[in-house]
Amino acid sequence: MKDKTILTAESVTAGHPDKLCDTIADTVLDCCLEHDPNARVACEVLATAGKFVVAGEISALTIPDISSIVRDTVRRAGYNCRDFDVEVLIHPQSPDIADAVADSGQAGAGDQGIMYGYACSETENLLPLPVVLAHRLTALLTCARTMGRISGLRPDGKAQVSVEYVFGAPRRISAIVLSCQHAEDKDLSQLREELLEFVIQPALRIFPADEDTEIFINPSGRFVLGGIEADTGLTGRKLMVDTYGGLAPHGGGALSGKDGTKVDRSGAYMARCIAKNIVAAGLAEKCTVALAYAIGRAAPVAVDVDTHLTGTYSDKLLEQAVRCFFDLTPAGMIHTLQLNQPIFADACNYGHFTRANLPWEQTGQAGKFAELCAQLDHGDGGG
């Protein structure tokens, strides 16, 4: 381990074009699940100047009014623009894939893939500190706009936080970058003062900056033209924002717009749930869990646990306990994590793993999991 390193994570507001597309896709999914808990949805969204395209596969009892969903979501994100077209290119799920995932009891995975989950003891919600701080900045930036604390803010915005680690522990914040769209007549010096007071200082209460922390606010200067009027958005383009800020591995599969039979989503959520419970149980200071699946197969083809030399037990024993304790089939993950409920649009902004009330963030089973590990350790004569 290096004596000193700098780790960085970023976040975006709900009005960022890519994240707006994610929200639309997950709202479509939620609307399908409201009427049909067994709906199969794979929804992609493209946003560009004057047009939204919603494409993908949906097999459900009721297909929602997708054009209305797009317009309502754009409005809720804070945009006033109404003059845009919505093109809907939706068709049913492939019958081959439908057959592979049809049996509700032993439903196979909807695709192959490897998903990673991560947790560490750095913060209250067991996420890396740069990730937590970046999301706090963008959430407070949006709050400052919607609550009227800062006038002239617009929906688009981004934040980035760099934290200096010494021997693996966070020591200080080395740099903060905050970019926010604003009205043309907004005074930039006033904007900086307001952002420091209402966004940056409150966001850093859990881990304050020091006098040497570099703070960059709109470092490119004016940021008047932004959002969907200036940039093209697409679902699945903010994978590191959604997960661990690039501080943990990622298998490459996006989360939003996919029902629970897609292991890109259910597997990623379950891997996070497992890693979080391992750390919450005091069995490791940090933990990475990997799950790999084959299309049409219910059980994972690989399960891996890595506690980065911080584990109470061997990684092999923890892997054995994971296989015994958690139902890792798609049907099991859907049931355990309540993935047939319309909960996704609320989860897709400011990180999928930042809200303690979400099913995959629960740690109520940590104690029982620790008991199982102790039993396995006693039975095999030691970890």
State each model region's role:
Residues 48, 286, 293-383:
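Internal helix-turn-beta structural module
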Residues 8, 50, 68, 75, ...:
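Glycine-rich, mobile lid/loop segments that gate access to catalytic sites or pores
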Residues 1-40, 376:
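N-terminal, positively charged regions that mediate nucleic acid binding
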Residues 10-12, 16-21, 107-123, 224-248, ...:
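Conserved phosphate/anionic-ligand binding catalytic regions in large, soluble enzymes, centered on
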Residues 39-43, 157-163, 213-217, 283-294:
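A short glycine-rich, hydrophobically flanked beta-strand micro-motif that places a catalytic Asp/Glu
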Residues 14-33, 123-139, 259-282:
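Alpha-helical support elements that line or immediately flank enzyme active sites
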